[in-house]
Amino acid sequence: QIVVVVPEKAEYEVGFYKWLEHLARMGEQIDCRITFHTHPATMKYIKGYMAQKHTNVRTNFVEMNKWSGIRQMAVGMNEDHMLVVVTARPGFISYSRAMDRFPQILSRHFKQTNIMLLYPDQWGDPMEELTIFAPNGRAVTVQPKSFGGWIRLGWRKLLSRKYTLTKKGKK
């Protein structure tokens, strides 16, 4: 079994679908169940992607609103399980200060568990908007929810266009 812990707002990071695709392929190739522990808002994107792209992968979804819940997960972990913790770098939307304590938590509570720490791509050409298909077949488009998300979106658009600087009076 692959147990994946995903932070809230991870769906807004550039590398979200890349790591999700790699884990889905891994689950498909070794024919094992993937259990995602994540915030309900992030869960709908993972569910939508898995339902659209990887219907044959067995998945479970568990709501996890706080990072403190990661300690209780150690009780149900076996030696043949793999724990994947999706993290983020400071300054990015899915980063939480609780992530700074992961090394201590993982070394103390998950000694006999295979662990993978994932730092997804956070640079590159993100999609300007995320589109997935809801289970009812309708397209769902999400725009950034935070002010910082709108600023980053505007900054990317500005950088994607070629602007020329001209002196006053010259064309």
Task: Give residue spans per PLM region.
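PAPS-dependent sulfotransferase catalytic core
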Residues: 75
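Repeated scaffold domains used in trafficking and secretory/extracellular systems
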Residues: 68-72
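Intrinsically disordered or low-complexity boundary/linker segments at protein termini
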Residues: 1-67, 78-82, 88-94, 102-171
